[in-house]
Amino acid sequence: LHLTIADTGWGKAIWGKLYGQMIAGANIFVYDHEKFTPADILGKIQDYHITSLCPPPTIYRFLIKEDISKYDLSSLEYCTTAGEALNYSVYETFKKITGIRLMEGFGQTETALTLGTFPWMDPKPGSMGVPNPQYDIDLLTHDGRSAEDGEQGQIVIRTDRGKPLGLFKEYYRAPDLTEDAWHDGVYYTGD
């Protein structure tokens, strides 16, 4: 039973809360709360025997500050996170408390998961993982060349050989914005 903590109106809900899980045949627990409290979420995990959980790192930071020992989280089998950088101490604390490794991912409203720590991988805290095989990912430096190991750059998706499944078509009624982000066979994520 999968729980993603994301407002259903948010882009994350499309692939991380509804469609991705439906395609995989998973059971989905949809819970939209007006105000987040760690005790509320931990209670839902316990009472409904949630097995798979995906909130952003900020939620994990709040969960580990709560007295988790008051809750039976033994149903949890798999936990992922996305939306911001995961702090190493949050990763380690959550793992120590639950025994579960947090698997990170990166995607945008414009894309599905583009980088991730996939189930067959050992997570490396601080790393978003590896490119999703459905995307031709590159890291471009400010001068437009592919970054070398250790260099910083912008995550881009090459589309010169075709548009991958999951990549948006265009920004609604904003052709200039679309052209700024996606031109010459490359989609620039801005990240």
List each model region and its residues.
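Active-site glycine/GP-rich loop and adjacent strand/helix microenvironment
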Residues: 117, 129, 148-151, 169-170
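Gly/Ser/Thr-rich phosphate-binding loop
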Residues: 18-19, 23-26, 50-55, 64-124, ...
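Conserved beta-loop-beta connector loops within the AMP-binding
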Residues: 138-158
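Short Gly/Pro-enriched turn/cap motifs at secondary-structure boundaries
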Residues: 126-132, 146, 181-185
